[in-house]
């Protein structure tokens, strides 16, 4: 059965995610109690919104779309006189892993924010599965809340704690339920963010450069973990990255976003296990780098 989708993601938000449309990158602890309360409420709302982006309110039209997790037609988003997304068309099938490449400012993160319900002011048709989660480059954990509570934020039911423990075990953090976020490494914090996304059993997971701030060895480990989790849970994945090799290693299909539209859409026809020494890998890398306007000698920048 095709998944049910919903239209016009920017129309309304669930009461659990009200007043948290923008991200809080860094929070400095205020000096006064009133300021503390205000900042805590904002950070809590932001983490809640990150965890529960899939709970955008229903509109009148809800329908299937031939097994698609995402279907976008003519999406346009402008900021003042600047057009970021210009008539974008995109379909992502249920269970498909799609990587999205593009230069800085090409609209990749804007697209993720629209699909996650963080950004409005759009025109065009945007459909996405009702159960969806977002993982950002920053883990966005509440620093004054223990790991398990960060994973289960916004959930209810008698089995919530057990579901959270299972999710943490899946990402290799069994026994860390009572750890404070400050005690976690960067890789561990991103594992918690993955657990928080997957504990909701989403049909669609969107990842916006989730491993960009990690060291090379940790990135390799996170690649293996993400592949394992995707095989187990089978969500559709929209994965934003600047790393061409990362896109080829992980995805079924790679897209390039240029000036608000998809300029390239190619399948990853590279045998598994994928190796950078494979001629097919090298050919696809060259194609993608050329589309991005990057000299292969500078590919490390991507």
UniProtKB/Swiss-Prot annotation:
Coiled coil: none annotated. Keywords: ATP-binding, Cell membrane, Membrane, Nucleotide-binding, Translocase, Transport. It comes from the Bacteria. Its EC number is 7.6.2.14. One of its GO terms (molecular function) is ATP binding. One of its GO terms (cellular component) is plasma membrane. It is a peripheral membrane protein. Its main location: membrane. SMART domains: AAA. Residues 30-57 have a biased composition (Low complexity). It catalyses: ATP + H2O + aliphatic sulfonate-[sulfonate-binding protein]Side 1 = ADP + phosphate + aliphatic sulfonateSide 2 + [sulfonate-binding protein]Side 1. Belongs to the ABC transporter superfamily. Aliphatic sulfonates importer (TC 3.A.1.17.2) family. The complex is composed of two ATP-binding proteins (SsuB), two transmembrane proteins (SsuC) and a solute-binding protein (SsuA). This is Aliphatic sulfonates import ATP-binding protein SsuB. It comes from Frankia casuarinae (strain DSM 45818 / CECT 9043 / HFP020203 / CcI3).
């Amino acid at each position: 059965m095709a998944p049910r989708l919903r239209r016009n993601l920017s129309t309304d938000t669930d009461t659990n995610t009200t007043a948290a449309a923008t991200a809080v990158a860094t929070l400095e602890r205020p000096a006064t109690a009133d300021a503390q309360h205000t900042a805590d409420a904002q950070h809590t709302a932001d983490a809640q919104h990150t965890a529960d982006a899939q709970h955008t309110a229903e509109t009148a039209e809800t329908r299937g779309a031939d097994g698609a997790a995402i279907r976008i037609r003519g999406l346009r988003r402008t900021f003042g006189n600047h057009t970021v997304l210009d008539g974008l068309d995109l379909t992502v099938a249920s269970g498909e892993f799609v990587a999205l490449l593009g230069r800085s400012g090409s609209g990749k993160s804007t697209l993720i924010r629209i699909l996650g319900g963080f950004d409005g002011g759009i025109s065009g048709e945007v459909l996405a599965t009702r159960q969806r989660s977002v993982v950002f480059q920053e883990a966005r954990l509440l620093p004054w809340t223990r790991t398990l509570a960060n994973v289960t934020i916004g959930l209810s039911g008698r089995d919530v704690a057990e579901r959270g423990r299972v999710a943490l075990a899946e990402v290799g953090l069994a026994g860390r339920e009572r750890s404070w976020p400050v005690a976690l490494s960067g890789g561990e914090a991103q594992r918690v963010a993955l657990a928080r996304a997957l504990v909701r059993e989403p049909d669609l997971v969107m990842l916006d450069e989730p491993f960009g701030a990690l060291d090379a060895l940790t990135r390799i480990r996170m690649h293996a973990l993400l592949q394992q989790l995707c095989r187990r849970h089978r969500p559709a994945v929209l994965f934003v990255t600047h790393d061409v090799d990362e896109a080829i290693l992980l995805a079924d299909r790679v897209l390039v976003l240029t000036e608000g539209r998809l300029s390239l859409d190619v399948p990853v026809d590279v045998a598994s296990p994928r190796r950078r020494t494979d001629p097919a890998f090298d050919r696809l890398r060259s194609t993608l780098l050329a589309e991005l306007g990057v000299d292969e000698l500078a590919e490390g920048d991507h």
